[in-house]
Amino acid sequence: MTKSEKIIELTNHYGAHNYLPLPIVISEAEGVWVKDPEGNKYMDMLSAYSAVNQGHRHPKIIQALKDQADKVTLVSRAFHSDNLGEWYEKICKLAGKDKALPMNTGAEAVETALKAARRWAYDVKGIEPNKAEIIAFNGNFHGRTMAPVSLSSEAEYQRGYGPLLDGFRKVDFGDVDALKAAINKNTAAVLVEPIQGEAGINIPPEGYLKAIRELCDEHNVLFIADEIQAGLGRSGKLFARDWDNVKPDVYILGKALGGGVFPISVVLADKEVLDVFTPGSHGSTFGGNPLACAASIAALDVIVDEDLPGRSLELGDYFKEQLKQIDHPSIKEVRGRGLFIGVELNESARPYCEALKEEGLLCKETHDTVIRFAPPLIITKEELDLALEKIRHVFQ
């Protein structure tokens, strides 16, 4: 039995089986490359679901984390830490918002945004108590906690978890008329992924985000953009909302915000929204901790200084066009923006992901029939060409 096999056996024995990973153990990583305990080398085309946009172990981010670890790691929010204010300023200026509220995981940030929207609905908009509604979209993925599960349209995400939470409506993604019909006097917010990731890299129709913005303005409803997976350069723009040139009332960010080395997420909005929180009304012991802020400051610097959105746009266009040229009866569609690309098949994508692993390329199926390609944004054209060579070989 190999070391990898022993690790997988141990993991399966003691761990809950809430994931079905490919049978590979990653023990080392740098840039776009990872290794297993046996020394086999693989190219990472998933980026930990876009949490590693800056590449594995980016030296600037790692150094920032090490330097901070030598000073102070956690103070809780009972006291001030010396880099939280700096991080607040950087992320607020980047997003063009007045205020930020840090959490740890994407799901926590979604929960925070939903709480903010409900309290805003009662305290600012004047909706009758306990009547506020939030509209989401079929195919959405906003996390695994109870509120995101309650607004999901996937039966398996909800099975056995009832009773689900009330106050959510769902409409079809891309259908302006359905959204218009769903909005009423009790609508507090519309929660949308500018690109639906887990649903299979679903791109909205042109002008759809603008239509959402206009409807929200017309009815005094908050436009909440979940940019956890598609944001911070992944789509070829700093934020995926930039494709429609709209400005949401609320941003939710996570994943690459921590540079792949420390979890941090955030809700960003103007004072009118985030000032609904008062001391004691919401919090997180680890939210905005010194280690997370240090890693995030460096992670954001890397995104801007190395122009990762621009790299993603240029290389993503090239990669997508090359994928479209692969002639195979199983390939139904190639779609995406930047280095956020889905190859939809007429059959299950899992066997193809397993075959690509054997070729030294790591990716993961989503929505059963879609292969998601989302490499670190630092990838080179030469590395993409190597990936394309392996992909063509599998489809031959």
From Swiss-Prot:
The modification N6-(pyridoxal phosphate)lysine is found at K255. One of its GO terms (cellular component) is cytoplasm. InterPro entries: Aminotrans_3, Aminotrans_3_PPA_site, Class-III_PLP-dep_AT, Orn_aminotrans, Ornith_aminotrans_bact, PyrdxlP-dep_Trfase, PyrdxlP-dep_Trfase_major, PyrdxlP-dep_Trfase_small. GO terms for biological process: L-proline biosynthetic process. It is an enzyme of class 2 (transferase). Catalyzes the interconversion of ornithine to glutamate semialdehyde. This is Ornithine aminotransferase 2. The keyword Amino-acid biosynthesis applies. It comes from Staphylococcus aureus (strain MRSA252). Coiled coil: none annotated. The keyword Transferase applies. Pfam families: Aminotran_3 (PF00202). Belongs to the class-III pyridoxal-phosphate-dependent aminotransferase family. OAT subfamily.
